[in-house]
Regions:
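Extreme N-terminal starter segment of soluble prokaryotic enzymes
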Residues: 1-2
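Residue-level recognition of beta-strand termini and adjacent short loop/turns
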Residues: 8-10, 23
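Short N-terminal binding/cap micro-motifs at the start of the first secondary-structure element
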Residues: 10-14, 38-39
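Short Gly/Pro-enriched turn/cap motifs at secondary-structure boundaries
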Residues: 18-19, 52-58, 106-111, 117
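Glycine-rich beta-strand-centered segment in the early N-terminal region that forms part
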Residues: 20-34, 47-90
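Cytochrome P450 core scaffold surrounding the K-helix E-X-X-R motif
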Residues: 39-45
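NAD(P)H dinucleotide-binding glycine-rich loop of Rossmann-like/cofactor-binding domains
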Residues: 83-120
Length: 120
């Protein structure tokens, strides 16, 4: 797939990347639109230690689901990834999950963003 990759401070490279792997319980999304957020700009300028190159930025994403229950449906991605196991997640307060992360971030774990043809 083609993706716009943050490769260095103030440097983005349009290049071929591997398609995202299917993750149990998630869908592969064919990206139709992806916004550029202020936090993406902070990363671009080297001002966000949670986003380190190389990384596909972009966490404001919509597109068409390619698999699963939502196959062929238009979807808007919730960029928040929570553990679904802690007391906050079990009480529908995923935004407080101590293990949470987001797409388009490299810390606490790498999860590629939506400035690409596909996202998981």
């Amino acid at each position: 797939m083609q993706a716009l990759v943050y490769t260095d401070i103030q440097t983005l490279t349009y290049r071929e990347e591997k398609n995202p792997k299917e993750v149990l319980g998630e869908s592969i999304i064919k990206v139709q639109a992806s916004g550029i957020c202020g936090s993406d700009m902070h990363a671009y300028h080297g001002k966000d230690e949670r986003r380190n190159p190389p990384l596909i930025l972009g966490h404001e994403v919509s597109g068409v689901s390619q698999n699963g229950k939502l196959k062929d449906k238009i979807v808007v991605l919730n960029p928040l990834i929570s553990c679904d196991k802690c007391k906050y997640c079990k009480n529908k307060r995923e935004h407080l999950c101590p293990n949470r992360s987001m797409v388009g971030m490299s810390k606490p774990f790498q999860r590629e963003g939506g400035l690409a043809e596909f996202i998981s």
